[in-house]
Structure formats: structure tokens, C-alpha cells
Regions:
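N-terminal secretory signal peptides and thylakoid transit peptides that target proteins
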Residues: 1-14
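Short, structured beta-strand/loop micro-motifs enriched in basic residues and often containing a Trp
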Residues: 63-73, 113-119, 220-228
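N-terminal, Lys/Arg-enriched amphipathic/low-complexity engagement segments
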Residues: 57-111
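Intrinsically disordered, low-complexity linker/loop segments enriched in Gly/Pro
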Residues: 140-237
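Short, Lys/Arg- and Gly-enriched loop/turn segments at beta-strand edges
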Residues: 95-106, 141-151, 251-261, 350-352
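C-terminal motif of bacterial Sec signal peptides marking the signal peptidase cleavage site
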Residues: 20-21
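Conserved mixed alpha/beta catalytic, RNA-binding, or beta-rich assembly cores of soluble enzyme
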Residues: 207, 214-231, 235, 241-311
Length: 373
């Protein structure tokens, strides 16, 4: 039985993440002073999309050791401190903790219990307080290895039974696939178990997890998505996009990890094409602006990420946020904003496997109407 299966059996949705906080002796904070200018960019006062990174932004270069990685959002002392306006150059591990390397490796045999989705961080953002927002502009995500892996774990997937979704019939066997990365062609290749069939996928790296400490001092496992971010498995958390996360605790305690090289909508088998990433992100702080659920932006699109169960509640969370955003930007009535979003938004199912499901609602910003005389 895999660690993911054990986790799903261990607690109902409402109780997931209510684990004891790690002590300071377990996760000692690192000094972590960014290189470069002592005075970083001042906190921003409005949540406008980040279009470029200042050339003189201070840089924190940090390669975490394996023992530096964390497996919860909240409950871990910060490993680094940064000022707003800092560029972070670092690395992060895959969801299997780097332990699964070949098709013969089974996660249940190779992974220590509780070591799903290791995170790089937490980063303490100086000046961040509850009610603020951290803006994480993803500058660069690149495969850090020449291979990636995917796996099916019994009891973990959209089309098998578990303690929350009962089904008759036997489960599928635990199975691993290894993907070879062709960096020159930007593809990943795999073969069927009997070797008779081969396929390849375009590589489009993204973070499976990115988040801050949850509200109320809660500690959440890195399996779970929520309003704090977490294990959203959203392909839009990629280079060129900016992720906005509401601050719930002093310093925000930003973490990211669970590198993905590719993934289909729904992540229906329970894992993407998983691999370690070389990372460059730029972190800003927006004071006195709350962000109730994760928002993603680029030059052309606005996106909201909703998580919950049942699936329709995840969609409702994201649609509600989108309607409120359109109303604020356009100054249309609530009903007109509702109608506009109803006819224009796209809503792909992001994942159907975690304790909370995730739906992305996205909209072309250029379609939002402006008032006429």
C-alpha cells in the first residue's frame, strides 16, 4: 500500500492537515540574506500583473539539501528570509522525493512514509502580514534531470475506489513509467510495459505545488490544495505567469515544489510526468490587498483556482471569484458580470485525485467590456 493510499485512508477531508506543527529544532531557520543591494524593491500597492523583473533586483541563490525539503504547508520554520522584490534562483524535487528512478521502482517500496511532494522553502517574506498578497512571478522552470517518472498507486486515481469514493471491482496494480527527456526537442518519451508501443509528450514544466502557510495556524500536508494554494497541480503555474497568494501568517511562508514536466487535464491516474526543476522566481509583496483564493495572471488572461469536493463546489469557488473580479474591473452590475462570465469563461478540470478536487476558471482579459458614454 502506497504512502498516498495510506494518507487518503488516514483522515476525512475536514480533518486533513490537522497535524502537529514541526518544532524549531526540527526545521532550523537559515540565515538566508539575499545577495546584491541591501534595499529591495518596495512593496507594491496594487495587484497589477508583473511583466518584467528589474535588472537590479537582489538575488538569493540557494540549492537546498534533501534534509532542507519540507512536506507540509505551515508548521515548518522558514529556511530563508527574503525582502520583497527578490529574485530566487533555486531547485526543487519531484513528487516522489527523488526516490523513483526506473520503471522497476515502485513508490510504495522506495519512498519514506509522508514524503510525498517535497517543497523548497518556506521563504519568509519580510513585511508580509495577514491581509496582504504575495505575487510570485515565475521567470524560469527547466528540467533538472534527463528523465522523469509517472506512476499509478493503488487507491489513488480518478477511476478507482478509495475511502471517499466506493467502487466495486479490483484495483489496478502499482505501476511506474520512466520518461526520457530530449532537451533538444523539448519532449519526453516513454514506452508501454511490453515495449511494443512508444509515445512522446511536449515538455511544459510547472509547479504541482505552490502555496503559503494556511490560516489559523493550520498545518496541511502537501497532498492537499486549498485557498492557501498547495497541491493544485495546475499547468498554468508555469514560466511567464504570476501567481497571487493571500497571506495568512507573518512572513507568508512561501513554498513550492512537485515539479511536473507535462500533465493532461484531470491528472486522472494520480501523477503527472514528474521531475525535478531548476527554478527562478521573482517575489513581490502587495500590502493591504487580500487574495481569498489563488489567482494567476499573464498579459492576456486572468485565472482563478478553486479547490473543493464535490467537483462542482471547486468550480463554484473559482467562478464566484471570477465574477467578483470582472465586476470590480468593469463596474458592471453583478448580474451583468455573471452573464459575461457565463458566456466567456473556460473551466478545465485540473485534477480529480486529491482530497480536494481543483478547477481552473480562465478568461481573456481583453474581452472585458468598458463603459461607453
Amino acid at each position: 500500500m502506497t504512502t498516498r493510499r495510506k494518507f487518503l485512508l488516514s483522515a476525512p477531508i475536514g480533518a486533513i492537515g490537522a497535524v502537529a506543527a514541526c518544532s524549531g529544532s526540527d526545521h532550523a531557520a537559515a540565515a538566508g540574506t539575499p545577495a546584491g543591494s541591501a534595499d529591495a524593491v518596495a512593496p507594491r500597492s496594487s495587484p497589477t500583473p508583473i511583466t518584467s523583473v528589474p535588472a537590479d533586483a537582489p538575488v538569493l541563490s540557494w540549492t537546498p539539501k534533501h534534509e532542507d525539503l519540507v512536506y507540509t504547508f505551515g508548521g515548518a520554520a522558514p529556511k530563508q528570509r527574503i525582502k520583497p522584490g527578490t529574485r530566487i534562483v533555486t531547485w526543487t524535487e519531484d513528487c516522489f522525493d527523488g526516490a523513483v528512478k526506473t520503471a522497476a521502482d515502485l513508490p510504495s517500496k522506495k519512498m519514506p512514509p509522508g514524503h510525498d511532494n517535497p517543497q523548497t522553502g518556506p521563504f519568509y517574506v519580510e513585511g508580509a502580514e495577514p491581509g496582504d498578497t504575495v505575487a510570485v512571478h515565475i521567470v524560469k522552470l527547466e528540467p533538472a534531470r534527463s528523465y522523469a517518472v509517472s506512476a499509478f498507486s493503488p487507491g489513488f486515481g480518478a477511476l478507482v475506489g478509495n475511502d471517499q469514493t466506493a467502487m466495486l471491482g479490483p484495483d489496478f496494480p502499482e505501476t511506474t513509467w520512466r520518461y526520457e527527456v530530449d532537451a533538444a526537442r523539448n519532449v519526453a518519451r516513454a514506452s508501454s510495459a511490453d515495449g511494443k508501443h512508444k509515445w512522446e509528450l511536449p515538455i511544459s514544466p510547472f509547479f504541482g505545488c505552490i502555496g503559503v502557510a494556511p490560516a489559523g495556524g493550520e498545518v496541511r500536508t502537501t497532498i492537499v490544495p486549498g485557498n492557501f494554494g498547495g497541491n493544485m497541480d495546475c499547468p498554468e503555474v508555469r514560466a511567464g505567469n504570476t501567481v497571487y497568494l493571500g497571506v495568512n501568517a507573518p512572513g507568508a511562508l512561501l513554498s513550492f515544489g512537485d515539479g511536473h514536466y507535462a500533465m493532461g487535464d484531470g491528472e486522472i491516474m494520480g501523477a503527472a510526468v514528474e521531475g525535478a526543476l531548476n527554478v527562478e522566481v521573482y517575489v513581490e509583496l502587495i500590502k493591504n490587498v487580500a487574495t481569498p483564493i489563488p489567482r494567476i495572471e499573464n498579459a492576456g488572461e486572468i485565472m482563478f483556482v478553486g479547490s473543493g469536493r464535490p467537483l462542482e463546489d471547486a468550480a463554484r469557488v473559482a467562478f464566484k471569484a471570477m465574477i467578483e473580479w470582472v465586476r470590480a474591473k468593469s463596474h458592471m452590475s453583478e448580474m451583468d458580470s455573471y452573464q459575461f462570465v457565463s458566456q466567456n469563461a473556460k473551466a478545465p478540470i485540473i485534477q480529480l485525485v486529491d482530497p480536494q478536487y481543483t478547477v481552473l476558471v480562465k478568461l481573456d482579459k481583453h474581452r472585458i467590456p468598458t463603459a461607453t458614454q
